[in-house]
């Protein structure tokens, strides 16, 4: 298995992992691999990681491999494109249940070419591609529903493809309504309490549209990785705008203090902006919304977090999407779409650096094939997330653009010139 060099985990990284296990899964009653979690925690607490606390000897095997070798062995490479389409020079994707969870509630949607419906009334049909990540919680039903129905709902939207922003907004609103009607029309006795975040990339000719509900994220690498920028904004209670919206709706935001009873009287309530700003500087703080206990403030579905009949505060959890639009240009390298399991342990910079590490480290042996290189980027991001002990499902999509294609072409040309010089010097 191709791996990059990594350092031994710091104490802060270990504490962060323990906190993520405790606050995000065990207490949420999510199905986890208890053996892995217990083994890890036991080794941490008993300090039996092949060295004493005073020893300077490095662990020979990376900690995540030592504890979770079986999970690494199960990891399978994802899939990638075979040819370009429109402005998309390549794409690749992969998803994995991760080190701790037994089930993968993440779903993805890949439609390289949206074909014109036979009954379509639009004369000119643009080149369009669709990519989506649906990060489920409380079960797989909602994420599966979005995956299975998003494209058909989009094609049926009255504004599509004339007004893309309205089409994306209308599609997500319809999916929220339809899922609720199908599974939870009787709010007192819901048949399915699952919910899902939604991150959509729709490429239309030379324009790129990103629609987001929840805490999955898309970032753009620019100018051969020397720059990057987040495209979407996370819908979480640590977002000041989301915090303000939740409070206005009548909800509360609190800091998860690892209290398994979830007694609202024993947690730290954030009462004002001053307290909010003070805690925001602590990377270990996990914000949650009371009374639904979610750490994300935007989802499709999730009736228990939205229905007054089930003691929720309506309006705290939103199903409204944000849409971001930009034109493609030669400086755009690629888009990375990822679920929160990736971003919980890798910063935006970490993510871009990992992707470019794969390009430069593994590209040569793949003969700088943009499709295979894009897949290496996906796989390495997931492996790096496991190295950082992400405790969640892991899903990544890479969309290669002009900048990446040109960079790889330059690599190929330099290699050809280098080989020619070597041959001439022999003569």
Regions flagged by a language model, labelled:
Residues 1-427:
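PP2C/PPM-type serine/threonine phosphatase catalytic domain
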